[in-house]
């Protein structure tokens, strides 16, 4: 009986997986079983951390806005300013407000004065 050579499909699948794991260290980039396990773990971590990143950035924006607003007025806080912002129907989200707080504090000061005046 003559020997039949295997096809290239399994080898192509393994090389594709190895390309994904080429930046991993040690056996995680060389051995097929550990590559597959690490790939599953990496994809799960990236999926989980995308949501975590959104939460972390929102916390950072809120902290920056709160710090900048407390410099303006002692009795004025983040929660009051956001409430007044919604009352005055200004369409500024937390990301934009945080950027304004870092780059141009005078502009944030003027916005907060307008909000307080609208109350």
Curated annotation (Swiss-Prot):
It comes from the Eukaryota. The keyword rRNA-binding applies. Its main location: plastid. PROSITE patterns: RIBOSOMAL_L20. One of its GO terms (molecular function) is rRNA binding. Keywords: Chloroplast, Plastid, Ribonucleoprotein, Ribosomal protein, RNA-binding, rRNA-binding. Pfam families: Ribosomal_L20. One of its GO terms (cellular component) is ribonucleoprotein complex. One of its GO terms (biological process) is translation. NCBIfam families: rplT_bact (TIGR01032). Belongs to the bacterial ribosomal protein bL20 family. Binds directly to 23S ribosomal RNA and is necessary for the in vitro assembly process of the 50S ribosomal subunit. It is not involved in the protein synthesizing functions of that subunit. This is Large ribosomal subunit protein bL20c. It comes from Nandina domestica (Heavenly bamboo). The gene is rpl20.
């Amino acid at each position: 009986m003559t020997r039949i050579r295997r096809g290239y499909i399994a080898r192509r699948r393994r090389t594709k997986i190895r390309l994904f794991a080429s930046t991993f260290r040690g056996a995680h980039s060389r051995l097929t079983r550990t590559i597959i396990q690490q790939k599953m773990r990496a994809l799960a971590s990236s999926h989980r951390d995308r949501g975590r990143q959104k939460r972390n950035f929102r916390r950072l924006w809120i902290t920056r806005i709160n710090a900048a607003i407390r410099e303006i007025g002692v009795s004025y806080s983040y929660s009051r300013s956001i409430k007044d912002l919604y009352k005055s129907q200004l369409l500024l989200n937390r990301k934009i407000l945080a950027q304004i707080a870092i780059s141009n504090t005078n502009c944030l000061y003027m916005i907060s004065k307008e909000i307080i005046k609208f109350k």
